[in-house]
């Protein structure tokens, strides 16, 4: 049988390549890094995590946790490696990003059915089956080709990555260990603020200079990765109801709740690096150091990486994609990852998993898989196909995408757990019916 091309070896492309190869089909995997880098990536490794190192909630009362469990049950490579290189993060799944991407790169490069090409692809394949997983930073030449193929203008907004600081530079006499509502282990470092400290920080944040933006469309910002300075501009209390909310965080040393709290999450397994949760930013690097050192406990913080901003380009999925992730008018071409309009690491990986499975089905002239709407995988794909196309915006997985339960349950945690149980039961039924191992 012919090989399937996978263009892009980010989260979605890496997962798609794995799913294709595990079914005995050869893969031609193309990745332009490190020959041609993007504004946001730092390495040539596959599945590099460029924003946070968190893969969101781990529990089955969390939609992202459900999606991850569904992927595990379909032998997701990225979930397997994420579990292998997990770092403590309370109720979330976070990974050592370097070990994570290095292991995925190694496994794919050494796979006997995967041929890796380190080169930029500038045109869409004219024959055969292909998965396009070029991500939010799709190279300009290929982006133009996609526009010609789909007839749709690409949309753009800002994504932002948070700064990382060293543990040894954090003042542990001011910061304290805790997880919100004592959920899970106390894996977060928390920097408490008084009202006076918060207001000083807030006003300096508003005055701080942002870096020059080149080649981006201004003004379109996805809520889930909004720069902290953009959020602050919405009002003085916005941050205290967002990433700096103090609820559920009590400093055991004082027994008091602070006016605001900045949380820091482990960036690596060794626990030597921490990222500032919710502090994606486009401030100039000098300004980041000046303003973020106003946070109690970070007065002498050593920044090993400053926050950066980068472009995100995505399709108007309802107009051009099917729920199997293929193009409506060119069904031999599949798309996966953030370019489809899913948002988030886990969601991108999930789309790659489904696109990879379906690329093989198309090659074998079998009906493609449309996962049940009761599953997170199915709900996400059906959202892309069935949303209104006017002002379509990226979406993360959430329980609102899944059908409600037949019996109303008021307790949110219990309700979500039952939705997850239903989803996993439906997935097992679907796997049995479709012969998925």
UniProtKB/Swiss-Prot annotation:
Belongs to the MnmG family. TrmFO subfamily. GO terms for cellular component: cytosol. One of its GO terms (biological process) is tRNA wobble uridine modification. It holds the Pfam family GIDA. Its cofactor is FAD. This is Methylenetetrahydrofolate--tRNA-(uracil-5-)-methyltransferase TrmFO. HAMAP family: TrmFO. It is found in: Cytoplasm. Catalyzes the folate-dependent formation of 5-methyl-uridine at position 54 (M-5-U54) in all tRNAs. InterPro entries: FAD/NAD-bd_sf, MnmG-rel, MnmG_N, TrmFO. Keywords: Cytoplasm, FAD, Flavoprotein, Methyltransferase, NAD, NADP, Transferase, tRNA processing. The keyword Repeat does not apply. GO terms for molecular function: flavin adenine dinucleotide binding; tRNA (uracil(54)-C5)-methyltransferase activity, 5,10-methylenetetrahydrofolate-dependent. Its EC number is 2.1.1.74. FAD binds at residues 8-13. Its main location: cytoplasm. Coiled coil: none annotated.
């Amino acid at each position: 049988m012919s090989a399937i091309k996978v263009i892009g070896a980010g989260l979605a492309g890496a997962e798609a390549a794995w799913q294709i190869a595990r079914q005995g089909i050869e893969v031609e995997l193309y990745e332009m890094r490190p020959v041609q880098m993007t504004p946001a990536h730092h390495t040539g490794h596959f599945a590099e995590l460029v924003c946070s190192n968190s893969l969101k909630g781990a529990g089955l009362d969390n939609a992202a946790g459900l999606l991850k469990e569904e992927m595990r049950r379909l032998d997701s490579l990225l979930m397997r490696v994420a579990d292998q290189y997990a770092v403590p993060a309370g109720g979330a799944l976070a990974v050592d990003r370097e070990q994570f991407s290095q292991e995925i790169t190694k496994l794919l490069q050494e796979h006997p059915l995967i041929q890796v090409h380190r080169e930029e692809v500038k045109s869409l394949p004219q024959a055969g089956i292909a998965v396009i997983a070029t991500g939010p930073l799709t190279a300009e030449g290929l982006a133009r080709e996609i526009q010609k193929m789909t007839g749709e203008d690409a949309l753009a907004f800002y994504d932002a990555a948070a700064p990382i600081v060293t543990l040894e530079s954090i003042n542990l006499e001011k910061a304290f260990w805790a997880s919100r509502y004592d959920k899970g282990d106390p894996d977060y470092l928390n920097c408490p603020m008084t009202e006076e400290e918060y207001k000083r920080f807030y006003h300096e944040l508003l005055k701080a200079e942002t870096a020059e933006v080149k080649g981006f469309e201004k003004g379109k910002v996805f809520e889930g990765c909004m720069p902290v300075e953009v959020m602050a501009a919405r009002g003085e209390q916005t941050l205290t109801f967002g990433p700096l909310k103090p609820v559920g965080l009590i400093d055991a040393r004082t027994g008091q709740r602070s006016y605001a709290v900045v949380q820091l999450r482990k960036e690596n397994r060794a626990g030597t690096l921490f990222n500032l949760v919710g502090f994606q930013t486009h401030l100039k690097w000098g300004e980041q150091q000046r303003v973020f050192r106003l946070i109690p406990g970070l007065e002498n913080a050593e920044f090993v990486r400053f926050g950066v901003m980068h472009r995100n380009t995505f399709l108007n999925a309802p107009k051009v994609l099917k729920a199997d992730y293929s193009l409506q008018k060119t069904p031999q071409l599949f798309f996966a990852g953030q370019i489809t309009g899913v948002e988030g690491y886990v969601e991108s990986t999930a789309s790659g998993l489904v696109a990879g499975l379906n690329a093989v089905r198309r090659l074998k002239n079998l009906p493609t898989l449309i996962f049940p709407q009761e599953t997170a995988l199915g709900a996400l794909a059906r959202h892309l196909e069935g949303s209104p196309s006017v002002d379509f915006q990226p979406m993360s997985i959430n329980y609102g995408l899944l059908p409600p339960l037949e019996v109303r349950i008021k307790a949110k945690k219990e309700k979500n757990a039952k939705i997850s149980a239903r989803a996993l039961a439906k997935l097992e039924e679907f796997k049995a019916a479709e012969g998925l191992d």
